[in-house]
Every structure is written in structure tokens, then in C-alpha cells.
Amino acid sequence: MLKRKAIASIKNWVNTKNKKCLVVQGARQTGKTYIIERFAEDNYEELLEINFKQMVSAVDIFSGDLTVDNMVMAMRFRFPEKKILPGKTLIFLDEIQECQEAITSLKFWAIDNRYDVIVSGSLLGIDYKRASSYPVGYVDYLRMYGIDFEEFLWGMGISEDMIGNLCGYLESKTVIPEAIHSQMMNYYRQYIAIGGMPEAVQKYVDTKDFREVDKIQRSLLLGYQYDIAHYATAEEKVKAEKCYLSLAKQLLDKENHKFQYKEVEHGGRAQKYFSSIEWLLRADMVHLSKLVTDVRFDLDDYARDDFFRAYTTDLSLLMAMKDFSLKQHIVENTLEGNSKGGIYEYAITDALYKKEYQLYFYKNETTKREIDVVIQKDGMVVLIEVKGGNTRANSLKSLMKNHKDISYGYKFADGNIGVGEDGIITLPLYMIAFI
């Protein structure tokens, strides 16, 4: 079993006084169901799990009056082998997007407050909009993502103490011994090639076979394409799939990583395809980095909604869009050109997305200054440049010189830790997991 950080978040929810129902959100196949089942196994006497895709007729439980006593009674008749007891039974409603009345019922479970209820499902951002009465104010949220690099290291047998020692070099800004740095870069390249989808990571942990990982990645991508075909409106199906499958080309095959509609279709325009991007966003299939015209706080004041970069929600899905040879080049460190810079930028944004940062990038056509990633942390703007090699970060240096309110910026590269007189902190690519 792969260790996941989400377990600690669910424990915090359980220990909350007067807790609400917990909605576990996130893209498909990120481990939501598995984590909830394992948590119930370790923390409850009984798990009552209803998967509305598998048990289609279970919607009848929610077809009458949505009082808790009525719903519990219906559950007891449907599942007589289960003991449904307050505080001792976890009620888990999976694939809840298939039963709108179950979504409505969350309000009444929360008001009653006798039973612990967790719900999950994919595409919730879309289907909640169709709920007859969404329980605003009666649910807590936990968003799950694919496995991050630290969780990957746990899966590879690297202990938390070892990671703590590694972070010590980050805190003191001292050079990491070459033997450790070299091995960490090897792990990081493996992680980029595998991505963070739990099934792909588990397959690698078990087999160390990238061909087997590749099969998993391609199967996952087909599942996402199926979801588009199944859940998107008739108007959006084809357009959304075209946009989604263009992402690798948008970010790895050209120098300018801006999402361009002409890469979706010859002559493509925002008027035709922007609604499809919005659909993919609500479906947890993509996330965006928006252009900012200035690097001052608050970044959202300077963001342009029409100028953005689009990313898959996990590296595993990006890998499935490309030939197997890309994984070979990543692991063997033989990438060159746009692909090298693009894949490392992708990995850095993937890590920050999983840390729940809002992502931006900066580009000034007049001065030719460009910053790959801009975020806000602790009320400050942080500039991040990503380098395939250990080259200079001229735009970063120039912007920090002209914006005295920006106290530091990062350059992530193949190299080791270093701090320049200009305030630029150079870090190995893998250190993005620990800032």
C-alpha cells in the first residue's frame, strides 16, 4: 500500500467536533476510493460503501423522504449484514455524481450529526451543478491529487528521516553531497516518467518495468477520454477531447507554451473552443497557469483569463500522450530542445498544483522578460524560473532588481543548491517538493 498524505487530512476531519460530511474531490484514478476504504478499515468497526455506478438500484435509498432515520432504515433493509451504528460505522457514498438525491441528502446527514459520512466521485465540479439542492455550508472538502514526489520517495523506500536530512540542506542553503544529489535526480527523472497516478506508481514499485507503467498510463488516458464522451454535452464531446489531446503538443513541441487554439484545429479560435477548456477545468482534467502583466501583489489583479497555459492534472496522463521513447529520454537524461525545458516546467507546475498554489506566468513582449512560474506564498510574490541546464536566469535577475518588494526568487535546474548575491536561490529540480 502506498502511503498517502490524505490519510492525515481525513483523520483531522474525523477528530473535528460537530463535523460536516466530507466531500473528497479530485480527478479520476487519483486514489480517492482506495484511501477511504483503507482509512475505514483502520478506524471503524464497519464500512457501509455504496458505489452508485456498481449498485444502480441503490438510488432507491434516497428516493423517499431524506430524513436520516428513513435513509438508515432503507440501508439496513438493503444491507442486513451491516451494522450501522453512530460513531462506529463509516458511510461511504462513492461515485455520488450518479445520484443527485444523495448529494442533496448531505445537508440532512450533517444536521443530524450522528453518523460519519464521506462521499466521493469524479467530475463533481460538473455534476454538482445539476443537483436539485446542493448542500452549501453542510460539507467539508478534501481535494486529492496524484502522488507527489515525496510520496513517491516513500514508495521507493526512502524514510521520512532521510527526507528530513535532505530538507536540512534546503534550510541551510548548503550544497548537497554529490552522491545524494545524483541519486535524487535519478529518482526525480523516474518520477517524471511515471507520473503520480497511484496505479502507475504501484506498478513501478512492484516491477520496475517502464513498459508495464506505459500500459497503465495509456489505459488511464483512455479512461479520461471515456469520461469526456460519457459526461460532456453533445456540443462539447469532440471539442473537449481535441483540446485535451493537444496538451502535450502545446507544452512539449513548441517554444511558446501558451495554449493556442490553432494547435487544436487548423484555424481554431477561442470563440469555438474556450467553453471546452472550461468544461475540462470543471471536470478536474486540466489546470491552468494564467499570464500576469505585472509581478506585484495581488497577482490576480494582473491576470488575463484569455492568455494561459493548460496542463493535465498529472504527469502520468501527459506521458500517455507521447511515445514511449520520451520516458527513455527522461530517465537517461538525454532530452534536448523544447522537450527538455517543457517537461521540467511541466514537472514544476505539477508539484505546485498539488500543493494548491494558484499558478501564473509572466511575459513582457517589449522587454522580452519571461518568468516560467509566478506564485504567491505567505503574502509575497515568488518568481520561479525552470532551466533544463544550469544556465543563467536573466529575466529573474532583472525583475528582482526592478521590484524591490520581491525579496527572493528561485531557479530550479539540474544543478545543486546555491545562493547568488542577487538574491536568486538555485535549487535542484526535485527540491520543488519541499519548498
Which residues are covered by each model-predicted region?
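Hydrophobic positions on the alpha1 helix immediately C-terminal to the Walker A/P-loop
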Residues: 35, 39
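Hydrophobic anchor at the beta1->P-loop junction of P-loop NTPases
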Residues: 24
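Interdomain motor-coupling "hinge/lid" segment immediately C-terminal to the ATP-binding subdomain
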Residues: 129-253
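Catalytic cores of nucleic-acid endonucleases
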Residues: 388-429
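Accessory nucleic acid-recognition modules appended to NTPase machines
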Residues: 202-370, 375
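N-terminal pre-Walker A segment at the start of P-loop NTPase domains
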Residues: 1-13
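Short glycine-rich substrate-engagement loop in P-loop NTPases that contacts/grips substrate
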Residues: 56-87
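Conserved lysine of the Walker
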Residues: 32
